[in-house]
Structures are given as C-alpha cells and as structure tokens.
C-alpha cells in the first residue's frame, strides 16, 4: 500500500512540474530569440560604423557609442573584437546579397531594366559596405574567413539561379555564370565607379541573354 501511495505521489508531483518545465523551456527560447535579435541589431550598427569611418579609424568606444551602450556590453555578444568584425561582416554582407537578389527579374522582359538600374542602385546603397568587406577579407588576419564567405556566396547564387530558372526559362547551370558576371561588374562599379568596365560587361550580357533565352525557347 505504501508503494502505491509513493507511486501516486510521484505521478501527482510530475504533473505539477510539467507546466513549469514547459514554461521554463518557452522562456529560455524567447530569451534566446531576444538575444539573437539584439545581437543582429548590434552587428548592423557596428558594421555601419566601420563602413562610415574605416576599419582602422574605428575604436571600441565608437562602436559602443553607435550601439548606445558601454564598451563592456559589446562583450555580451562577442568574445573579442575580431569575432565582432568576422560575424558582423558575414551577417551584413549576406543581407546585402539578399537585397540585391530581391531585385532580380522574374520576367525576361524585365532583364534590360535590371541591367540598367541595379548597378547604380547597389553602388549608392551598398558601396561603403562593399569597400569595407574587401578591406576586411583581404586583410591577412581575416582572409581565411573571406575564402569561406565567398564559397558560400557561390552556393547562394547557384540557389538563386535555381529559383529563377522556371521564371526566366533559362537552365540554372547557364544562368549562374551570367549572375556571377553581372554581380562582379556591379560590385566593381560600387567599389571604384569604373563606368567603362561596367558598360563593357553589360554590353556582353545584353547581347548574350536574348540569345540564351531564344535558344531555350525552342
């Protein structure tokens, strides 16, 4: 009888604890979401601060001021200044990629407009960020992270090409290198405002793309 009482008590206790345990798990999950959202906000503010003032011209105080809190608070989110630079660059430049590809044409008739407008738009919107990215990823301290980032870029643009394939009627294996040419020309223009280089690349694309579309219509 005593064993049965112990058993019933343990069942009752377990049922009393379950809601609290679930509530604790939910609270931890929410806290983690809040932490991650704040970290992303900090990464954007720090990256923008670096983009405005340069990698070498920006100290920890300037970063903390941009975020609106103390220098020590930065280390709530990052183990070191190097970690902040590495994580912020990867996060913010992936967002730039998304911004860029959100403007990708979904109709063949829109491709010419895309070629004409987007290089100038991204130079205006993202030029400082591109320059900072190259400053960071060509630095000996960060170059391995740059290699890893650009491997990811290649994979992501391939995925974009797969998404565009049914909309444009061009196989992704053909579309991917065309995207690479266009992105490289756009980024080069954003970095150096080299109009001659940009137009020479766009001329090739504007001649090639209609031929490619016509080929795969058949």
Model regions and ranges:
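N-terminal intrinsically disordered/low-complexity leader segments
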Residues: 1-37, 218
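Helix-turn-helix
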Residues: 41, 45, 49-83, 87
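Solvent-exposed, amphipathic alpha-helical segments
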Residues: 41, 45-52, 99, 103, ...
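Hydrophobic alpha-helical connector segments
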Residues: 87, 100-125, 172, 176-179, ...
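Short, basic, alpha-helical segments at the C-terminal edge of helix-turn-helix-like DNA-binding modules
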Residues: 90-97
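Amphipathic alpha-helical packing segments from all-alpha helical-bundle domains
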Residues: 97, 141-169, 173-177, 203, ...
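Short secondary-structure transition hinges
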Residues: 120-159, 192
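Amphipathic C-terminal alpha-helical segment
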Residues: 121, 135, 176-199, 210-218
């Amino acid at each position: 009888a005593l064993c049965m009482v112990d058993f019933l008590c343990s069942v009752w206790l377990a049922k009393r604890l379950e809601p609290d345990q679930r509530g604790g798990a939910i609270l931890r999950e929410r806290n983690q979401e809040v932490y991650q959202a704040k970290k992303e906000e900090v990464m954007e503010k720090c990256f923008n601060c670096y983009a405005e003032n340069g990698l070498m011209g920006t100290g920890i105080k300037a970063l903390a001021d941009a975020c609106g809190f103390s220098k020590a608070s930065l280390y709530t989110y990052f183990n070191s200044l190097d970690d902040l630079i590495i994580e912020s660059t990867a996060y913010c430049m992936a967002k730039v990629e998304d911004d860029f590809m959100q403007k990708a044409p979904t109709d063949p008739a829109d491709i010419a407009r895309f070629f004409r407008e987007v290089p100038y738009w991204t130079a205006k919107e993202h030029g400082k960020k591109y320059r900072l990215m190259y400053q960071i990823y060509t630095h000996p301290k960060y170059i391995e992270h740059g290699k890893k980032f650009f491997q990811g870029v290649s994979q992501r643009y391939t995925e974009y090409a797969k998404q565009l394939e049914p909309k444009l009627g061009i196989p992704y294996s053909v579309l991917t290198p065309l995207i690479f040419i266009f992105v490289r020309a756009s980024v080069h223009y954003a970095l150096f405002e080299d109009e001659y280089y940009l137009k020479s690349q766009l001329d090739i694309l504007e001649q090639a793309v209609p031929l490619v579309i016509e080929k795969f219509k058949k």
